[in-house]
């Protein structure tokens, strides 16, 4: 088990430092999580050596019988997990999955209607700096002044735009997404409907958030975040024709050989998601996020939409004299890792922002519950109340490190 340590101590030393960082810091970036040693072990397996262009039973290389077996297992487990008919587990990331759907279902300059990035959307939902906003004509809907999606307004925009594809899903929206409403809107304007559930997939799998099926034509997700699997992407549908187009779009459309070792790890992760204890984890994720939101509101902070239904909390500082970047850096000094984030009504640049996004997945994976989240939320508020008090931040960091070391998740950097 010491091959890397003995062969390349310089690399191993960096690994050890990252392990120490992950152990000592309270990871509260909503898109990050701690995957299991079994998933990491699968990613470091002999499958990292195998090329397998194509799909099970239709490869361009020989010697793929076991690559076929592991990919078929991942597909079957994903189908069971999400209750769908067709799954492509080859996308290298959520962005690749979204790009694959667009290539499959759209032509250049077709219209996309997605959620505004500053209102909680994602780059790949048509942002002008992303390929999705360069290849296609992108239009946006957002949230109202209270931070909720206004479905009547979405319908009004859709009637004007007449998009070929509507994208529902977000990277910083703390409320339940009403897929049925989006289906009604899509049907009214004759659009296809895609759900990007990258952030909430683990909740959907556990029944803690409504499923996008049967309302959406196609569904994309990452396999990490709330699913706690390896970093990767996936596309799902119940439509055989769409599935065929998507398979061709992923390979040979935008990718060559799949990452078979990552697909193996996806299979392991899906196996974990199918276990009864997964439902308990997902439920605790929501409870912990709700605890966090309640404490912050009680401490006088503006939680966007007035709370949360999922794993994340979005805090706005539009009423404060400091920025999201200031808060991000101050909390980092206190041993709490969050990310600066744009908020509804944003007045600052995306590099500065007026808010932060805080998530519960990683600390819930470490075994923390309401008591710990109440304590941490109060420490977050203490930091924000004293945004420039570096000495206080360092004192709080000592307390947070002591707390973190009670919930150690890894005993070594590689598995």
Swiss-Prot record:
Cofactor section: pyridoxal 5'-phosphate
Chain positions with N6-(pyridoxal phosphate)lysine modification: 225
Superkingdom of origin: Bacteria
GO molecular function terms noted in the UniProt entry: glycine hydroxymethyltransferase activity; pyridoxal phosphate binding
Record keyword Repeat present: no
Alphabetical list of InterPro entries matching this protein: PyrdxlP-dep_Trfase, PyrdxlP-dep_Trfase_major, PyrdxlP-dep_Trfase_small, Ser_HO-MeTrfase, Ser_HO-MeTrfase-like, Ser_HO-MeTrfase_PLP_BS, SHMT-like_dom
One CC-aspect GO term: cytosol
PANTHER family: SERINE HYDROXYMETHYLTRANSFERASE (PTHR11680:SF50)
Main function: Catalyzes the reversible interconversion of serine and glycine with tetrahydrofolate (THF) serving as the one-carbon carrier. This reaction serves as the major source of one-carbon groups required for the biosynthesis of purines, thymidylate, methionine, and other important biomolecules. Also exhibits THF-independent aldolase activity toward beta-hydroxyamino acids, producing glycine and aldehydes, via a retro-aldol mechanism.
Catalytic activity field: (6R)-5,10-methylene-5,6,7,8-tetrahydrofolate + glycine + H2O = (6S)-5,6,7,8-tetrahydrofolate + L-serine
Keywords: Amino-acid biosynthesis, Cytoplasm, One-carbon metabolism, Pyridoxal phosphate, Transferase
UniProt family annotation: Belongs to the SHMT family.
Pathway assignment: One-carbon metabolism; tetrahydrofolate interconversion; Amino-acid biosynthesis; glycine biosynthesis; glycine from L-serine: step 1/1
EC numbers: 2.1.2.1
GO biological process, one term: tetrahydrofolate interconversion
Binding-site residues for (6S)-5,6,7,8-tetrahydrofolate, renumbered to this chain: 117, 121-123, 349-351
Known partners and oligomeric status: Homodimer.
Localization terms from the record: Cytoplasm
Top EC class of this enzyme: transferase
Protein name: Serine hydroxymethyltransferase
Site for Plays an important role in substrate specificity, residues: 224
């Amino acid at each position: 088990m010491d091959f890397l340590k003995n062969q390349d101590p310089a690399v191993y030393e960096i690994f050890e430092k990252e392990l120490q960082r992950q152990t000592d810091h309270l990871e509260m970036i909503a898109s990050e999580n701690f995957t299991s040693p079994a998933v990491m072990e699968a990613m470091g397996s002999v499958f990292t050596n195998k090329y397998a262009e194509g799909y099970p039973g239709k490869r361009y290389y020989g010697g793929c019988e076991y690559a076929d077996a592991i990919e078929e297992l991942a597909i079957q487990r994903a189908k069971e997990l999400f209750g769908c008919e067709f799954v492509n587990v080859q996308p290298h990331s959520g962005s690749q999955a979204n790009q694959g759907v667009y290539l499959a279902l759209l032509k250049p300059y077709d219209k996309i209607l997605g959620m505004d990035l500053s209102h909680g959307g994602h780059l790949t939902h048509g942002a002008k700096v992303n390929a999705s906003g360069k290849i296609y004509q992108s239009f946006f809907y957002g949230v109202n002044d209270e931070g909720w999606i206004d479905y009547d307004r979405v319908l009004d925009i859709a009637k004007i735009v007449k998009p070929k594809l509507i994208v529902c899903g977000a990277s910083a929206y703390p409320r339940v997404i009403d897929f049925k409403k989006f289906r009604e809107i899509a049907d009214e304007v004759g659009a296809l409907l895609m759900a990007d559930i990258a952030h909430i997939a683990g909740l959907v799998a556990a029944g803690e958030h409504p499923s996008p099926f049967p309302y959406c034509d196609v569904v994309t997700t990452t396999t990490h975040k709330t699913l706690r699997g390896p970093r990767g992407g996936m596309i799902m549908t119940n439509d055989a024709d769409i599935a065929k187009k998507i398979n061709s779009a992923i390979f040979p459309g935008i990718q060559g050989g799949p990452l078979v070792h990552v697909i193996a790890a996806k299979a392991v992760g899906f196996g974990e998601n199918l276990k009864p204890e997964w439902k308990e984890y997902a439920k605790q994720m929501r409870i912990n996020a709700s605890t966090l939101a309640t404490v912050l509101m009680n401490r006088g902070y503006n939680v966007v939409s007035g709370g949360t239904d999922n794993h994340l909390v979005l805090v706005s500082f539009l009423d404060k004299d400091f920025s999201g970047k200031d808060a991000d850096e101050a909390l980092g000094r206190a041993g709490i890792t969050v990310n600066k984030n744009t908020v509804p009504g944003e007045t600052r640049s995306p590099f500065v922002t007026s808010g932060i996004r805080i998530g519960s997945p990683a600390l819930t994976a470490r075994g923390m519950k309401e008591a710990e989240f109440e304590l941490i939320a109060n420490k977050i508020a203490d930091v924000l109340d004293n945004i420039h008090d570096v000495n206080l931040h360092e004192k709080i960091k000592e307390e947070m490190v002591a707390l973190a070391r009670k919930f150690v998740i890894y005993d070594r950097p590689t598995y």
